[in-house]
Amino acid sequence: MIRKTSAEILSLVWDWIRTTPLYEAVPTMYLDHFPTSASHKLSGEFIVLTTLSNVIGEQQVATVNVNIYVPDTTPRINKEEQRYPDNNRLSELTKIAYDSLRCYPLDERYFFDVLDESLISEAEIPYTLSNIKVQLKNY
């Protein structure tokens, strides 16, 4: 049985997302990390795909992070700018991601499913992300 590399798995998830309502909602995607150069200032919502693990044994099991970044809201309270997650938008996009990534077969031997999800606030940038772990299994 031919096993898939991490790069091949990322490509499969990337290609799949581009066909789903998640991509319609958030069409800006990056592999491995978001741009950090001064010439590319972050704006709006975006998705970053990374691999966590790719265990190749009798059964191949790989985990991919699908991170959906949403800008924080920044209201002023007592003339001080505050940062708060946009929980409504994070919830909306996470539900779209669940529906887009849940239980889909790649071919007769590979199957992806949502494993878990958590919210993470970024300290260096004014974003909160929905970190969705998607697991590929080969049967």
Q: Which positions does each model-derived feature cover?
A:
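A short, hydrophobic beta-strand-centered structural micro-motif
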Residues: 41-51
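A short acidic/basic microdomain associated with nuclease active sites
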Residues: 25-37
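Charged, amphipathic alpha-helical segments and their flanking helix caps
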Residues: 1-26, 50-139
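A short beta-turn/loop motif at secondary-structure boundaries
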Residues: 36-41, 121-125
